[in-house]
From Swiss-Prot:
Reactions mediated catalytically: 1-(5-phospho-beta-D-ribosyl)-5'-AMP + H2O = 1-(5-phospho-beta-D-ribosyl)-5-[(5-phospho-beta-D-ribosylamino)methylideneamino]imidazole-4-carboxamide
Subunit annotation: Homodimer.
Pathway it works in: Amino-acid biosynthesis; L-histidine biosynthesis; L-histidine from 5-phospho-alpha-D-ribose 1-diphosphate: step 3/9
Top-level taxon of the source organism: Bacteria
Protein name: Phosphoribosyl-AMP cyclohydrolase
Subcellular localization, as worded in the UniProt entry: Cytoplasm
């Protein structure tokens, strides 16, 4: 799968050719996780609506939930004003975090909301 050249031209990638992907749950608006995408992962996500990311440690693409069953159906993808981050709005099945938690931001609260 090839990324549309008009989209590719708008991306500002890091030195490794990746953009940041922020993943938000459609219903709750919770931020579930942050991951990386290369052009091919973004192209696959846009074509299939299956959240696909790039693993820096493994050096390859991975489809969220392919092995765990904790899938993300992508409703929308938005590009930020700088072109270096995409926002995916998803329906999450199971935990989004590799720990099994609903969100990667469930564990440590550094500053609690004021009442």
């Amino acid at each position: 799968m090839t990324l549309d050249p008009q989209i590719a031209a708008r991306l500002k990638r890091n030195a490794d050719g990746l953009v940041t992907a922020v993943v938000q749950e459609r219903g709750s608006k919770d931020v579930l996780m942050v991951a990386w995408m290369d052009d091919a992962a973004l192209a696959r996500t846009l074509e299939t609506r299956e959240a696909t990311y790039y693993s820096r440690s493994r050096g390859q693409q991975w489809v969220k939930g392919e092995t765990s069953g904790h899938t993300q159906y992508v409703h929308s993808v938005r590009l930020d004003c700088d072109g270096d981050t995409v926002l995916l709005t998803v329906d999450q099945v199971g935990g989004a975090c590799h720990t099994g938690d609903h969100s990667c931001f469930d564990a440590d609260v550094l500053l609690h909301p004021q009442d």
